[in-house]
């Protein structure tokens, strides 16, 4: 049973003095969209009678996602409801990423599982120019865990945390990250659909509050050369009857057989999934040696160089950390394909290769080959081609999203390859 009923929403809209409601949904690339209505139309929206484009698709509001925006005026407030998208015949729209995740979660539920996810979202705070336009300038030299006055973004980050808490987030920690102007705010893990919704809200809050401080927040994976990029590590676990099924006290690593199968499924399908977890041309500028980002498809409970890490917490906190995703990934699609891969590992009881407890970046090519360690795709084109050839990904995403996503991403790559970059001008113009 949901948290709110229709009567609850109508009452809260009145009590909160809400004048505008944003009916939010997400496109296949993870970009947040909305249709705004006045409070006079809220009952119509709650009865699923709002058309998003005037004819072809309808928004079905998820009552439990009702929140007011704390940064808006407190008289005549603005609230939001996240919507599922349906066709006029009452069937789910195949292009709705939320529907894709719901399908994967239903498959897990049919096996008795519930998925929990805890993301670690990193971002940069840059200066804006005299016209308020974003730059990549920062005048700070702060690094990991530094604080003010070195951390120029401390005040903005604090206001982000307070705003997120007002919107129901349980913030566990916030701190400066490794690169100058880079930050991380961690919120408590939760059920996968709620967490995916929260990631979209998180990004909206971070960008909005940064702008109020005269800054530009960006989730671009690698906005500057020579520094660490921004990731979105995904900590995942499955529970059954309220118990974390990844934990097993009798195992030497404290992991259950289901956990090993789940990891094997992730590793089996990782190259096919990378175009979803790392969706931009720029994503692959982060996935290079020397900047704390994974490149090789391996796992470990002891070091951070592999793709999959098992954090030290055990018991209820036992989880699998996937370290390649970045914050530009569509969270609904990323969680859906990770869950489907893990479930495939469990269903097929895939054997897991031995862990790699040494630094993979120090292994020779021959040593990696002997251990059957593959690399992630080196660029977006390679990732999309891996995805395009995958029956697993077509089934996981559905024909509608699969076809449109791969086509759009190849177009993005082709557009990129036609650009003449500053690096080319600097290295070739005066030499040839």
Label the predicted regions.
Residues 1-173, 195, 215, 370-432:
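ATP/Mg2+-dependent ligation/transfer catalytic cores
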Residues 27-29, 86-92, 149, 189-195, ...:
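A generic structural motif
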Residues 201, 208-211, 215-216, 239-432:
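Catalytic-core signal marking the mid-to-C-terminal active-site face
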Residues 70-77, 115-116, 174-179, 227, ...:
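Short glycine/proline-enriched loop/turn "hinge" motifs that connect secondary-structure elements
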Residues 148-156, 173-179, 191-202, 206, ...:
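Short, contiguous, pocket-lining structural segments
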Residues 81-87, 183-189, 236:
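Short, hydrophobic beta-strand segments
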Residues 116-127, 136, 167-187, 217-235, ...:
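Core alpha/beta catalytic barrel or barrel-like domain that forms the active/cofactor pocket
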Residues 137-147, 180-195, 224-229, 241-246:
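Active-site-proximal beta-alpha loop/turn segments in soluble metabolic enzymes
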């Amino acid at each position: 049973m949901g948290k709110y009923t229709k009567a609850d929403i109508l009452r809260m809209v009145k009590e909160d003095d809400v004048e505008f409601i944003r009916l939010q949904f997400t496109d296949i690339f993870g970009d947040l969209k909305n249709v705004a209505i006045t409070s006079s139309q809220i009952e119509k929206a709650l009865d699923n009678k709002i058309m998003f484009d005037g004819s072809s698709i309808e928004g079905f509001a998820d009552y439990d996602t009702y929140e007011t925006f704390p940064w808006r005026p407190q008289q005549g407030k603005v609230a939001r409801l996240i919507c599922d998208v349906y066709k006029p015949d009452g069937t789910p729209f195949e292009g709705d990423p939320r529907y894709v995740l719901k399908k994967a979660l239903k498959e897990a539920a049919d096996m008795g599982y519930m998925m929990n996810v805890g993301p670690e979202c990193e971002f940069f705070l840059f200066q804006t120019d005299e016209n308020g336009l974003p730059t990549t300038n920062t005048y700070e030299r702060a690094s990991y865990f530094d604080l003010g006055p070195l951390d120029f973004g401390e005040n903005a980050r604090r206001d982000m945390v307070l705003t997120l808490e007002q919107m129901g987030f349980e913030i566990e920690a916030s701190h400066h990250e490794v690169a100058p102007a880079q930050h991380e705010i961690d919120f408590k893990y939760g059920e996968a659909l709620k967490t995916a919704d929260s990631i979209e809200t998180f990004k909206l809050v971070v960008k909005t509050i940064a702008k109020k401080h005269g800054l530009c927040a960006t989730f671009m994976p690698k906005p500057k050369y020579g520094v660490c990029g921004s990731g979105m590590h995904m900590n995942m676990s499955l529970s059954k009857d309220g118990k974390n099924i990844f934990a097993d006290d009798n195992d030497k690593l404290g992991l259950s057989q289901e956990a090993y199968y789940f990891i094997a499924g992730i590793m089996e399908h990782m190259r096919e999934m990378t175009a979803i977890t790392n969706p931009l041309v720029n994503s692959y500028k982060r996935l290079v040696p020397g900047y704390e980002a994974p490149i090789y498809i391996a796992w470990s409970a002891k070091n951070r160089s592999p793709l999959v890490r098992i954090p030290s917490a055990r018991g209820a906190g036992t989880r699998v950390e996937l370290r390649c995703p970045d914050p530009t990934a569509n969270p609904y699609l990323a969680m859906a394909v990770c869950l489907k891969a893990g479930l495939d590992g469990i269903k097929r009881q895939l054997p897991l290769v031995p862990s790699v407890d040494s630094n993979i970046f120090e292994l020779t090519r021959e040593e990696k080959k002997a251990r059957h360690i593959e690399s992630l795709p080196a660029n977006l084109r390679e990732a999309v081609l891996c995805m395009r050839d995958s029956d697993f990904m077509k089934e996981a995403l559905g024909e509608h999203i699969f076809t449109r996503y791969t086509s759009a991403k190849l177009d993005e790559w082709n557009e990129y390859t036609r650009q003449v970059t500053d690096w080319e001008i600097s290295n070739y113009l005066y030499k040839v």
